């Protein structure tokens, strides 16, 4: 589980900078289990990712071409990960008073040539997405492989 020191560090960085990059925050055995789950999921569990939500959700290959599979607690790796993230959610609420009420997560698979164009990770007119987490499960990833997350400051400068 997340330690008090880890939670303090994450909350302080989010309050000061608006983001944090963490290496080796989750146990190695959990990462291996999540990667195994992600790659062993059958093809029919991955679906074309959409943009928007609820009635406004649509598949738009001009915006994103990845496929996603939702993580749930039906397997040990998913349960352990979601429990860890639930503790993080609770700790951030306690330290930052941000009112995050739930957490959802999915695996995303980007085939060669797939992408997700620059976007705001919140829905227009809603304030429900306050914190976003990204966990890379790629083994032996190198910068020339592409796929980096690019974060922009409010004035659009790349961080």
PLM feature spans:
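Fe(II)/2-oxoglutarate oxygenase catalytic core
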Residues: 1-132, 136-159
